[in-house]
């Protein structure tokens, strides 16, 4: 459980985070979304006690991060890339962290295994790819078997296989009852794993909602269907609440139903489908609309003041 | 995993592990005996009685290689703290030990004890080796002579304190080149510049600058016009305490 109470962070004249309050609950994945530079990393740094808030405070598991006797057991964090010494091996990096808490050596081997780094464990981190560096950061986050996991842009630099691995990992961590808080600037990626969303723009809270509500309100969730028999399928799918548009011949955008219903309907009537894709791009669009508004709003305010 | 807590002993284990798992530590520490013994032997081999170096203290003469050691342990001190900022490792370190100060104290303790041990071993090796070449000269001396052991041990203690001072500077400056710049500028070059000034009070103060105090500490026979061994050691300790205290205050306040 993470709680932010009116967090505010100012660097000189620049206010990066303003009066931010939210709660992240255990047992689900919570996405922390915002465009680049919206204050996500600063917020995470304040939660972890790396930066002191100008006002407000954050707690993890009921108290300030630094007040926990075993911080790594309370929160495991993937920080921005390169939070390590490039001259040290992956194994020694993790061992040094483990030693601060008396975490057994066997656990170091376990997280190396879990992140697929066992073979690279004794290589110096200098030679690691971006993806391997991310995996090592995730290994460090899991080292203390933490109740809460905080990951800053975990899919950055990962190959498609790695992205898939992260999705599964996040869901399984949440299923174990842990609090999982994942920042990202990609709505479509986040919507695949998260159930809850906290969206910020320019350091302010824009939305604290579920993915389901966000999708419904955004009007996203259209399904793209490519079929040689479009007219028939349109007739079969027509129902109250279902809207179908066909901008190009043979390609339908269906709103108001899901891929499962469309697929079954087509199969039942022997209609060939070339493509059946839930349209995540419109979700991305809704997210961009939401955050762009906040940026424009802020810009207008500044203009009015000047 | 029920007994997980951060304790001072565990932080010590972690910092000890960190120091020995990067190559630069091994390289730097290996250079200390190599350069000191090498310089000592070269001096011993080329020394002539009654020459220009006759009035140089015997310990200072044989340990002339400590000029290199000053730089080496200084760099090592800066790397220990500022290196974590340059690489970004500091974020991991401070997430594991969010109370922060135990990390600073532990780093200082680990670096001081390792420096002291390596330098003392080097000195106890260098002096007798150089003396085998100086046996028939006016610089002949043995470990049992008055002040010799005190100067050899004092030199090691002084260099350990210099390393801690550098570590404090590294933590304050948070940049390896910046830290090395401040170290050489303020500690090595500044006293030489100040000495040129025609004021006695400045001369008195310069005596207690780290490098000057270290020179004084390395004398078997205290020379007039330099600090006494006790005062020199105290001065070096105060430099270390002052920089480390400033580093601690800022470490607690600043964002990582």
Residue ranges and their predicted role:
Chain A
Residues 2-195, 199-201:
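ABC transporter nucleotide-binding domains
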Residues 66, 85, 103, 188, ...:
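Short alpha-helical
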Residues 101, 177, 218, 241, ...:
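Conserved NTP-handling cores and scaffolds of large molecular machines
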Residues 101-105, 163, 227, 255-257, ...:
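Short alpha-helix boundary/capping motifs
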Residues 110, 212-216, 300:
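Short, flexible cytosolic linker that couples an ABC transmembrane/permease module to its adjacent nucleotide-binding
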Residues 116, 241-245, 272-276:
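A short linear hydrophobic-aromatic micro-motif
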Residues 166-253, 257:
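ABC transporter nucleotide-binding domain
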Residues 255-306:
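C-terminal coupling/interaction segments
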């Amino acid at each position: 459980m993470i709680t932010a109470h009116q967090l505010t962070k100012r660097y000189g004249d620049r206010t990066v985070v303003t009066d931010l309050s939210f709660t992240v609950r255990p047992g689900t994945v919570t996405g922390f979304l915002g465009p680049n530079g919206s204050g996500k990393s600063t917020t995470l740094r304040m939660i972890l006690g790396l930066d002191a808030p100008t006002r407000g405070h954050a707690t993890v598991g009921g108290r300030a991060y630094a007040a926990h006797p075993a911080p790594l057991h309370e929160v495991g964090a993937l920080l921005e890339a390169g939070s390590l010494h490039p001259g040290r091996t992956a194994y020694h990096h993790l061992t040094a962290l483990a030693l601060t808490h008396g975490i057994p050596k066997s656990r170091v081997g376990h997280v190396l295994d879990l992140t697929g780094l066992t073979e690279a464990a004794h290589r110096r981190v200098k030679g690691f790819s971006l993806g391997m560096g991310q995996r090592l950061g995730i290994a460090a986050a899991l080292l203390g078997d933490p109740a809460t996991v905080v990951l800053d842009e975990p899919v950055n630099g990962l190959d498609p296989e790695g992205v898939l691995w992260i999705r599964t990992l996040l869901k399984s961590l949440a299923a174990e009852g842990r609090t999982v808080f994942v920042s990202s600037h990609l709505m479509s990626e986040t919507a695949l794993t998260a159930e809850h969303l906290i969206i910020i723009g320019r350091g302010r809270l824009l939305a604290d909602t579920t993915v389901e509500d966000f999708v419904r309100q955004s009007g996203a969730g259209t399904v793209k269907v490519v079929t040689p028999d479009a007219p028939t399928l349109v007739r079969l799918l027509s129902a109250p609440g279902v809207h179908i548009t066909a901008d190009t011949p043979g390609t339908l955008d269906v709103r108001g139903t899901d891929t499962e219903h469309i697929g079954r309907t087509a199969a039942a009537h022997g209609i060939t489908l070339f493509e059946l894709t839930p349209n995540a791009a419109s979700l991305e669009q809704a997210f961009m609309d939401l955050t762009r508004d906040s940026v424009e709003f802020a810009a207008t305010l500044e203009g009015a003041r000047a | 995993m029920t007994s997980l807590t951060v304790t001072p002993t565990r932080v010590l284990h972690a910092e000890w592990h960190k120091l020995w798992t990067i190559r630069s530590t091994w390289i730097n520490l290996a250079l200390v005996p190599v350069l000191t013994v090498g310089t000592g032997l070269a001096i011993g081999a080329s020394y002539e009685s009654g020459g220009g170096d006759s009035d140089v203290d015997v310990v200072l003469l044989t340990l002339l290689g400590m000029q290199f050691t000053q730089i080496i342990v200084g760099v090592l001190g800066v790397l220990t703290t500022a290196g974590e900022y340059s690489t970004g490792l500091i974020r991991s370190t401070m997430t594991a030990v969010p109370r922060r100060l135990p990390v600073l104290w532990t780093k200082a303790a680990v670096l001081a004890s390792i420096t002291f041990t390596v330098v003392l071993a080097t000195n106890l090796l260098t002096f007798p080796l150089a003396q085998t070449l100086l046996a028939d000269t006016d610089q002949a001396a043995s470990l049992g002579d008055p002040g010799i052991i005190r100067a050899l041990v004092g030199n090691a203690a002084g260099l350990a304190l210099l390393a801690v001072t550098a570590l404090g500077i590294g933590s304050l400056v948070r940049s390896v080149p910046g830290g090395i710049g401040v170290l050489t500028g303020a500690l090595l070059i500044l006293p030489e510049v100040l000495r040129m000034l025609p004021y006695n009070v400045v001369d008195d103060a310069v005596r207690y600058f780290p490098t000057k105090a270290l020179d004084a500490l390395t004398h078997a026979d205290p020379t007039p016009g330099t600090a006494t061994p006790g005062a020199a050691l105290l001065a070096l300790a105060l430099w270390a305490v002052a920089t480390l205290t400033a580093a601690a205050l800022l470490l607690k306040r600043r964002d990582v």
